[in-house]
A protein has these predicted regions:
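Ligand-binding beta-strand-loop-alpha-helix segment within the catalytic cores
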Residues: 160-182, 186-190
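Glycine/threonine-rich beta-strand-loop-alpha-helix active-site module
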Residues: 135-157
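Short, flexible loop segments at boundaries between secondary-structure elements
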Residues: 150-165, 302-317
Length: 352
């Protein structure tokens, strides 16, 4: 059944064609309920998606488009903005290749341009492979950096969302040594503000922001490092002067337990793994038979952009690409969160 044009048009970039991106796109849009809440269009390659449909055994047809507004937006049919940019012989399944990296970058570029021009309401990105992107000549540390560069923003941050936990990172794809150097008052203050605004957009009117320390025990009064005293505490004080309920610095080994206990609505982490490790520890689902991690549910949101962008919180998983085993839960959650954020923007709220 076709859905009305008042539903948000959501672009879903296919990700690296050699990874699990095509499969999780197909599995997500095989769910008829998606068409009750949005008008989804995949930005990708029709030939790759046909291969994914055959792999999953889904009873779906493809509708290649040259204009996203021409989609039928009907359950059972996948509308795809077909860039036709993949040679299946060059971009093999489960392998790093410059050809696949180039294609993945082009999906993101097209999706950003369309969303910026208001041809779409939001962009949801499938997983890319950083090595493949760089081999193709696009020298970025990750998806977030690509988006920031294409859009031309300098102040942005990554937020992960999963099962009531929300974490915003002071830095992401840099070495740990450099991440320590990026713990500066102005940057931490900016990230606290982005976290505050994001929480409000998620429906939390007066969010409590738990700000993690950088060092063990949040520095223990300067015994284990002075970044808390010199940079983080002044940033928290400045945020509080703006009316933001920022608390900290909280020892990094307890801040997430406190957030799970509802003491904080959002955590500001000082670097990539400080935020990612706890989120992925609770975010992975375990196989009931083997006890091994099999799927992750979390969603990545980019803050500081003029458009809504969400993403899966996992990689290309080359080791299972082409097997039909990929779990699409993170992609499904990313689409639903994008729909929610678009709805709030339409209601007059500022989306970050």
């Amino acid at each position: 059944m076709a859905r009305g044009s008042n539903l948000p048009l959501i672009l879903i970039t296919m990700g690296d064609p050699s990874g699990i991106g095509p499969e999780i796109c197909v599995k997500t849009l095989a769910d008829e309920d998606m068409y009750q809440v949005c008008r989804p269009v995949i930005v990708g390659d029709a030939a790759v998606l046909r291969r994914a449909i055959e792999l999953t055994g889904a009873h779906l047809t493809l509708n290649p488009l040259s204009n996203v507004s021409d989609g039928v937006f009907t359950a059972g049919t996948i509308d795809v903005l077909d860039l036709a940019n993949v040679d299946l012989a060059l971009a093999g399944v489960g392998k790093v290749s410059p050809a696949a990296g180039k294609a993945a970058y082009e999906y993101v570029h097209a999706g950003v341009e369309l969303t910026l021009s208001n041809a779409a309401d939001a962009i949801v990105t499938g997983p890319i492979n950083k090595e493949a992107i760089n081999l193709a000549g696009y020298h970025y540390a990750g998806h977030t950096e690509i988006l920031a560069d294409l859009i031309g923003v300098r102040q942005y941050a990554m937020m992960l969302v999963d099962r009531g936990l929300r974490v915003v990172h002071n830095s992401t794809h840099v070495s740990l040594r450099k991440a320590c150097d990026l713990v500066k008052q102005d940057r931490v203050m900016t990230v606290i503000k982005l976290a505050h605004e994001a929480a409000r957009d998620l429906g939390i009117p007066e969010p409590r922001i738990g700000v993690a320390g950088l060092n063990p025990h949040a520095g223990e009064g300067g015994l284990f490092g002075t970044e808390e005293i010199e940079e983080i505490i002044p940033a928290i004080s400045a945020a509080r002067d703006f009316g933001i309920d920022a608390i900290g610095p909280v020892p990094p080994d307890s801040v997430f337990a406190k957030a799970r206990g509802a003491q904080y609505d959002v955590v500001v982490a000082m670097y990539h793994d400080q935020g990612h490790i706890p989120l992925k520890t609770v975010g992975f689902e375990l196989d009931g038979t083997t006890g091994r991690a099999k799927a992750v549910r979390g969603v990545n949101v980019t803050l500081g952009l003029p458009i809504v962008r969400t993403s899966v919180d996992h990689g290309t998983a080359f080791e299972i690409a082409g097997t039909g085993k990929a779990n699409h839960e993170s992609m499904r959650e990313a689409v639903l969160l994008a729909v929610r954020l678009v709805g709030q923007r339409r209601n007059g709220k500022v989306i970050v």
